[in-house]
From Swiss-Prot:
UniProt KW keywords: Cap snatching, Endonuclease, Eukaryotic host gene expression shutoff by virus, Eukaryotic host transcription shutoff by virus, Host cytoplasm, Host gene expression shutoff by virus, Host nucleus, Host-virus interaction, Hydrolase, Inhibition of host RNA polymerase II by virus, Manganese, Metal-binding, Nuclease, Phosphoprotein
Motif (Nuclear localization signal 2 (NLS2)): 184-247
Gene3D superfamilies per the UniProt record, alphabetical: Influenza RNA-dependent RNA polymerase subunit PA, endonuclease domain
Family of the protein in this entry: Belongs to the influenza viruses PA family.
Protein name (Swiss-Prot/TrEMBL): Polymerase acidic protein
Pfam families for this protein: Flu_PA
Subcellular location: Host cytoplasm; Host nucleus
Positions of Mn(2+) 1 binding: 41, 108, 119-120
Primary role: Plays an essential role in viral RNA transcription and replication by forming the heterotrimeric polymerase complex together with PB1 and PB2 subunits. The complex transcribes viral mRNAs by using a unique mechanism called cap-snatching. It consists in the hijacking and cleavage of host capped pre-mRNAs. These short capped RNAs are then used as primers for viral mRNAs. The PB2 subunit is responsible for the binding of the 5' cap of cellular pre-mRNAs which are subsequently cleaved after 10-13 nucleotides by the PA subunit that carries the endonuclease activity.
InterPro entries according to UniProt: INFV_PA, PA/PA-X, PA/PA-X_sf
Annotated gene: PA
Self-association and partners: Influenza RNA polymerase is composed of three subunits: PB1, PB2 and PA. Interacts (via C-terminus) with PB1 (via N-terminus).
Species per Swiss-Prot/TrEMBL record: Influenza A virus (strain A/Ruddy Turnstone/New Jersey/47/1985 H4N6)
Length: 716
């Protein structure tokens, strides 16, 4: 491509293009498509102005070869192709002499006949898309836009094409020739695909008042004014290559930019080790609910009353016993804890009036489970600073874990529909302005797609548990309070339903700092036999506590009911975020909106209705080993929501690091996919940064395996 550009274009144009690229730190040898695009644009600007003059009478005339003495003035001032400082100087002087409004961005030409700036566009895509992008970018009625394409189409503001037919035909013919020349050398496809949308660089904000004074005060030494400094920055000529810049910074740094090819990326290395285990604060797909429909009992809405009434709906309780002990814990204590909960609930029932909250007796099993008196005693530093061998505890490296299949199943389940609705329509907030008519239409469509989703159940369950736990932590700091895990929903028929998942007992909670930990024991009902995937339940002690009759196609069957018990902990900041899990709805709604926006801008009308109602169309959801998975728009909504919810449920430093670092690699691979010929340095360092986050977290490991699927398909 580089050779082609040097043969095909006038050397002056090539030189200007090289200068322009170096000014932005780009290398014409690497970004060859961009090099070709800049040359083409320059040539079109020059052809646009060629042979057009204004005579003594101020009339516009075309002179191809004439009397050199005629008093002619060029009709167009060429701004494109000058260095930025000079270009702005020209623009400013035109504005001062003609009174035309100063543009925010550098235009390409000025037309002395029509007295307007002109923005020229040359596009490899459809002219109307590019026209819209230009118009959106410059947002000025005054600048005239004229777009040409390589297929001979053109589009201009108000269909006013400025030039005569013949001059425009010359430009179109030249563009068509360039296209054919490229195609004959096999360069056209890559060039056509490499076009990016408009980028906004040249914004000029007028700064006045206090801000202006602050700006003047904070200039680097030797600059008298902001204009002065701006002109210096605009005119600053970097040498164009990152290598040069880096070598100025440090003697030790040497960066060679390596081309990133389809053969370059390798898959991420996932850790070996025992399979990873469940670490969410509450059970997800394995949870079991005891429910009451149309609750109307006394004290309905008071958690303890609701819980007792849910417990009464079940008749299959039996003597509990341990069927999957916890590897490290004192398992009989977990058993005694459950027995204590049952006994204390029974005591409440026997009282005349049921209290609103229940504080558990501080038995030895509860003290053990909640880590009471386990924290090492804090000693004032003053008292021990003279101790000679004072040192911090050695902490063990976390043990590596391998990806287990259960986390993908958890995710699939989170995307499914349940038979209840978990949010009302107004869960996402109300309209304020008329513009929001479209917004509320989108919101209603979106809510309809996700209101029955299991991920939405997890949101409401998370909000409830975190709110209750934070409340109790502040209101009953010293008490071992019993907190029921409750959610509310509506059945298909619109009947209200209250669900009990189990109980939490919180430990002492004198939470001064955001990160101070409150311990709690969770006890959750389930029908999942832990012996099927013992590695998933490593952190739990599981009891069998009853038998449940289930209606199936073949009649009633009895299934053992289990109780998953574990010690866990959380902090004020984690509970605060847990209480705000509804934000996941908003995040995924915004992702869907940007998809609708993209469609709408192509079709030039709002596509919300078509988007949600065209049931036949499928959309990309994600990548699996089989390739790109597609599904209905509802499935896309639910998948995006589930991702957002899992990011919240499985939030961790490993996830933060993985998301930030893998995104860099993702962008490089996408650039490769778009034939933008990306280059990298220290790719090994990037891989290291990503892989140091792959330790033992199930959600991070799953994301890494998805990333590998994406890599495989992206570089094919």
């Amino acid at each position: 491509m580089e050779d082609f550009v040097r043969q095909c274009f006038n050397p002056m144009i090539v030189e200007l293009a090289e200068k322009a690229m170096k000014e932005y730190g780009e290398d014409p040898k690497i970004e060859t498509n961009k090099f070709a695009a800049i040359c083409t644009h320059l040539e079109v600007c020059f052809m646009y102005s060629d042979f057009h003059f204004i005579d003594e009478r101020g009339e516009s005339i075309i002179v191809e070869s004439g009397d050199p003495n005629a008093l002619l003035k060029h009709r167009f001032e060429i701004i494109e192709g000058r260095d930025r400082t000079m270009a702005w100087t020209v623009v400013n002087s035109i504005c001062n002499t003609t009174g035309v409004e100063k543009p925010k961005f550098l235009p390409d030409l000025y037309d002395y006949k029509e007295n307007r700036f002109i923005e020229i566009g040359v596009t490899r895509r459809e002219v109307h898309i590019y026209y819209l992008e230009k118009a959106n970018k410059i947002k000025s009625e005054k600048t005239h836009i004229h777009i040409f394409s390589f297929t001979g189409e053109e589009m201009a503001t108000k269909a006013d094409y400025t030039l005569d037919e013949e001059s425009r035909a010359r430009i179109k013919t030249r563009l068509f020739t360039i296209r054919q020349e490229m195609a004959s050398r096999g360069l056209w496809d890559s060039f056509r695909q490499s076009e990016r949308g408009e980028e906004t660089i040249e914004e000029r904000f007028e700064i006045t008042g206090t801000m202006r004074r602050l700006a003047d005060q904070s200039l680097p030494p030797n600059f008298s004014s902001l204009e002065n400094f701006r002109a210096y920055v605009d005119g600053f000529k970097p040498n164009g290559c990152i290598e040069g810049k880096l070598s100025q910074m440090s003697k030790e740094v040497n960066a060679r930019i390596e081309p990133f090819l389809r053969t370059t990326p390798r898959p991420l290395r996932l850790p070996d080790g025992p399979p990873c285990s469940q670490r969410s604060k509450f059970l997800l797909m394995d949870a079991l609910k005891l429910s009451i429909e149309d609750p109307s009992h006394e004290g309905e809405g008071i958690p303890l009353y609701d819980a007792i009434n849910c417990m009464k709906t079940f008749f299959g309780w039996k003597e509990p016993n341990i069927i999957k002990p916890h590897g490290k814990g004192i398992n009989p204590n977990y058993l005694l804890t459950w027995k204590q909960v049952l006994a204390e609930l029974q005591d409440i029932e026997n009282e005349e009036k049921i209290p609103k909250t229940k504080n558990m007796k501080k038995t030895s099993q509860l003290k053990w489970a909640l880590g009471e008196n386990m924290a090492p005693e804090k000693v004032d530093f003053e008292e021990c600073k003279d101790v000679s061998d004072l040192k911090q505890y050695d902490s063990d490296e976390p043990e590596s874990r391998s990806l287990a299949s259960w986390i993908q199943s958890e995710f699939n389940k989170a995307c499914e529909l349940t038979d209840s609705s978990w949010i009302e329509l107004d869960e996402i907030g109300e309209d304020i302005a008329p513009i929001e008519h479209i917004a509320s239409m989108r919101r209603n469509y979106f809510t309809a797609e996700v209101s029955h989703c299991r991920a939405t159940e997890y949101i409401m369950k998370g909000v409830y548990i975190n709110t209750a736990l934070l409340n109790a932590s502040c209101a009953a700091m010293d008490d071992f309070q019993l907190i029921p895990m409750i959610s509310k929903c509506r059945t298909k028929e619109g009947r209200r339903k209250t669900n009990l998942y189990g109980f939490i007992i919180k430990g002492r909670s004198h939470l001064r700092n955001d990160t101070d930990v409150v311990n709690f024991v969770s006890m959750e009902f389930s029908l999942t036999d832990p012996r099927l995937e013992p590695h998933k339940w490593e952190k739990y002690c599981v009891l069998e506590i009853g038998d449940m009759l289930l209606r199936t196609a073949v009649g009633q069957v009895s299934r053992p009911m289990f109780l998953y018990v574990r010690t866990n902990g959380t902090s004020k900041i984690k509970m605060k975020w847990g209480m705000e899990m509804r934000r996941c709805l908003l995040q995924s709604l915004q992702q869907i909106e940007s998809m609708i926006e993209a469609e709408s801008s192509v079709k030039e009308k709002d596509m919300t209705k078509e988007f949600f109602e065209n049931k036949s169309e499928t959309w990309p959801i994600g990548e699996s080993p089989k390739g790109v998975e597609e599904g209905s728009i509802g499935k896309v909504c639910r998948t995006l929501l589930a991702k957002s919810v899992f990011n919240s449920l499985y939030a961790s430093p490993q996830l933060e690091g993985f998301s930030a670092e893998s995104r860099k690699l993702l962008l490089i691979v996408q650039a490769l996919r778009d034939n933008l010929e990306p280059g990298t340095f220290d790719l090994g360092g990037l891989y290291e940064a990503i892989e140091e986050c792959l330790i033992n977290d199930p959600w991070v490991l799953l994301n890494a395996s998805w990333f590998n699927s994406f890599l495989t398909h992206a570089v094919k």
